[in-house]
Every structure is written in structure tokens, then in C-alpha cells.
Amino acid sequence: MDITVRKPTDHEIAAMKSKPVWTCEVSEFEWSYDSEETCLLIEGDVTVTNGSKSVSSAAGDLAVFPKGLSCVWQVRKPVKKHYLFK
């Protein structure tokens, strides 16, 4: 299962700004997705590892985490993000 990280379009940024906000301090934790999550990082820097694959994301990135993904989040700088579960 691949994690997608890219720069969002202006339309995606506008749409995500109406979604809830989640924050997290510097930490490391395991997470499993029972539904797909799309998030727009407003602040912070993270690396998410799924087995041998690692993906980094920073403020301004749009990330999509697929349903069924089990991973480890390493929050290197405090995170603030808008999120949407589908």
C-alpha cells in the first residue's frame, strides 16, 4: 500500500480548509487506517514508515493514506493538519 504525498492544487487547499484540524507534538506512534485519509499539512514535518518504505511530508503537502495501511508516524516537528476520512 502506497502513501501519496504531493503539492495540492488551489482547489484542494480551499476544500481542505473547511475540514477538521488535528495537532500532534514531536512523538513516534503506530497507526492503522480503517478508512482512507486525505490530509493537508499546515505545519510540521513527519516521516511515515510502512515496512521498508518511508515517506516524508512537510507543511504545504497533501498526503493520502490508503485504507488498510499500518504504519509508524515519526513527528519531527509539531504537526497541524486538516484531515478527511473517506
Model-derived features with residue positions:
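Ligand-binding loop in jelly-roll beta-barrel domains
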Residues: K67-K86
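Conserved short histidine dyad/triad with adjacent acidic residue
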Residues: R6, M16-D34, P66-G68
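Short strand-coil-strand connectors
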Residues: E25, T49-K53, R76
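Cytosolic regulatory regions built on CNB/CRP/Popeye-like sensor folds
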Residues: M1-P8, E12-I13, S54, A59
